[in-house]
């Protein structure tokens, strides 16, 4: 590597190197400043959460219903759907009718999945029985008697 090419590389990347040095230095400065300026509480209640003057009751750990995880998964799925449809909509002139048919098939497959989720009761928020039990009441009654 000749001297001129290495100088060119340094000239092109000096701003990024300075950014990295400043970012790492700022992080270290904030951590060290917090360690020096922070209080040293060695009391019995150090690890209890602060509740704005109200005595804490119970633990800080809460059990979330599985419905929250389902909603998060549905959000990610439909967010990815929106991402694909946005990419398709920006290139609609280049893709033409073939792209339109492909996008329509994509939307229909996702709508079929949504209809399936609604039919099995995956989107119901009530903790009562699911729609599977409502569709087949004979099976649910025989299961309860056993």
Swiss-Prot record:
Molecular functions per Gene Ontology: NADH dehydrogenase (ubiquinone) activity; NADH:ubiquinone reductase (non-electrogenic) activity; quinone binding
Keywords recorded for this protein, A-Z: Cell inner membrane, Cell membrane, Membrane, NAD, Quinone, Translocase, Transmembrane, Transmembrane helix, Transport, Ubiquinone
Enzyme class: translocase
EC number from the UniProt entry: 7.1.1.-
Gene Ontology cellular-component annotations: NADH dehydrogenase complex; plasma membrane
Pfam families: Oxidored_q4
Record flagged with keyword Cell inner membrane: yes
Catalytic activity: a quinone + NADH + 5 H(+)(in) = a quinol + NAD(+) + 4 H(+)(out)
Transmembrane stretches, start-end: 16-36, 68-88, 98-118
Subunit structure: NDH-1 is composed of 13 different subunits. Subunits NuoA, H, J, K, L, M, N constitute the membrane sector of the complex.
Protein purpose: NDH-1 shuttles electrons from NADH, via FMN and iron-sulfur (Fe-S) centers, to quinones in the respiratory chain. The immediate electron acceptor for the enzyme in this species is believed to be ubiquinone. Couples the redox reaction to proton translocation (for every two electrons transferred, four hydrogen ions are translocated across the cytoplasmic membrane), and thus conserves the redox energy in a proton gradient.
Protein name (record): NADH-quinone oxidoreductase subunit A
């Amino acid at each position: 590597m000749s001297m001129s090419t290495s100088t060119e590389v340094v000239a092109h990347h000096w701003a990024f190197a300075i950014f990295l040095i400043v970012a790492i230095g700022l992080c270290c400065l904030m951590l060290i400043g917090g360690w020096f300026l922070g209080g040293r509480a060695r009391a019995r209640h150090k690890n209890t959460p602060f509740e704005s003057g109200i005595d804490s009751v119970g633990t800080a750990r809460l059990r979330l219903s599985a419905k929250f995880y389902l909603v998060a998964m549905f959000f990610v799925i439909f967010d990815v759907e929106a991402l694909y449809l946005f990419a398709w909509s920006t290139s609609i002139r280049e893709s033409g009718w073939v792209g339109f048919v492909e996008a329509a098939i994509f939307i229909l497959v996702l709508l079929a999945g949504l209809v399936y989720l609604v039919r099995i009761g995956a989107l119901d928020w009530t903790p009562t029985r699911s729609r599977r039990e409502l569709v087949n009441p004979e099976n649910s009654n025989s299961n309860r008697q056993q």
